[in-house]
Amino acid sequence: MARPEQPVDIEHLNRYTGGDGGLNEEILQLFATQCREMMDRLESLASGDADAKSWRETTHTLKGAARGIGAFALGNAAAEAEKAGGARPAVLPALEQLKTTSAAVYLFIEQFLKDRR
């Protein structure tokens, strides 16, 4: 039976870290912090007149960071949000998808770090 896709592909991350567990932990902690900051920024942008340039820059940064650690579903959601271009109401469903996907990533990272202790 195939294992469901995980929010973060640790094997992908391992290819970049040489399987260094300590480095994986550091990268995942840093990503979680930065992701929360970017999500806060996107929520702020979506709650008012979203600045299209800031929306695209933030979603683009999130897309690259997520894909870099192996959080491909989050990276794909960020790519879709980037296409929304910052215009309301188009950003609202994109933001909801980002919230759902990022929450799964946060939980995965939290459990991964807990299991390593």
Where would I find each of the regions flagged by the language model?
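An anion-binding catalytic pocket shared by soluble metabolic enzymes
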Residues: 62
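A structural signal for alpha-helical segments
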Residues: 23, 50-57, 86-93, 97
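Amphipathic, coiled-coil-like alpha-helical segments
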Residues: 2-8, 27, 31-39, 65-80, ...
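Short, charged, low-complexity loops and linkers
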Residues: 12-26, 57
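Helix-loop segments that flank and shape redox-cofactor active sites
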Residues: 37-54
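Alpha-solenoid HEAT/Armadillo repeat architecture
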Residues: 17-18, 47, 67, 83-86
